[in-house]
């Protein structure tokens, strides 16, 4: 059967290849590594994707064309090219490519991250900025961040008294997960009978795993579908989606049926805000939110929010332990500015005094952007980038990791040196194309303020209350990376906390 299918599809594939080559010969396309028939450059993409693309760009140039099966992908690895994509041609490049996984998990474009550019994406982004990520709303969740950090400190003190080694990676993922769960659902993570820490971590891992490009995305419909069917990809994708959807149904239904379970009755959470908007729009003729939009938004907030904030804190702590001079300077600033805290917990307003801590976070984001390739974009029209023709419906990837380590932009780029940002106007909010941890333009991450507030307070608590050392058996910290869309430390960060008196 498979041999018959091969002979049936072969003429179709060869015809498509010929037509593509004829069109490409008339354009000034970006440089590209040598390709193989049908698979294109797929055979050259080994190892961590962002590092592989970094190496290919060093060899072929900062605007690099790759052919993945039957789709074109352009990789951007310079500040100048990134500015053209994200600023000059932002409008022509502000939609997302439609893939099997993104269509499934976004419920066909009903979320913030993957909605195609248009009325839906604009309304969802406006809704998120007003109701969830505005300065006022971020500040309203301050009590959650302070309470959850206080709980983390108490648990770490128990471990410190016993001189136990702590898995700080797990601790920080749980901290951020708890903060976002409370802000979203109005109850503590450990209070929901349908949710547990291990299940959420497992689902987050599974979603990332099935979220990459599949054969259906890069080969003609029949061929790609058949390859995914044989490999079990369709079945796995559906299974993970059902698990995520079931989890969301449980927490949303519980929220609606048992409002008394909420930790803080008098303070609206994110679901409250979305439901209120849905009710208000019932009589409105314009764009209407549905439960699918609600699920898509929650999924974006939780999956993206937990990963990025926790990963940033983990890399920051790893770099600080690896660089004791920087650690000492950060702790001295924190302990001098805050003074002695007896019974009361650290408050978020304390962060405003800590300029060096902010530099540490900025340097961490330069070296370790949590999503090194950002989220993919797709051109909606023919454009030119650095003089090269970029056809419509080309996937664009901006390698923020590569730009952040470019020796033409940064002195000693591999060195962790927060002082490089003293009196430096560069920021991480999409205005400086030398570092783009959250992207830029119309598709910039809307949750920057919430994420940075979480990271600042988390690191402040870790560095104020504790000194840190490696476990006896460890001589150094393994900084090897792992992951797909987001990049974590491959080996969990295990440290011994010592209570600072």
Curated annotation (Swiss-Prot):
Keywords associated with the record: Heme, Iron, Membrane, Metal-binding, Monooxygenase, Oxidoreductase, Transmembrane, Transmembrane helix
Gene Ontology CC, one term: membrane
Residues noted as binding heme in the record, renumbered to the chain: 445
Pfam families: p450 (PF00067)
CDD domains: CYP71-like
Tagged with keyword Oxidoreductase: yes
Compartments (UniProt record): Membrane
UniProt key word Oxidoreductase: yes
Principal location listed in the UniProt entry: membrane
Annotated family: Belongs to the cytochrome P450 family.
Protein name in UniProt: Cytochrome P450 71B3
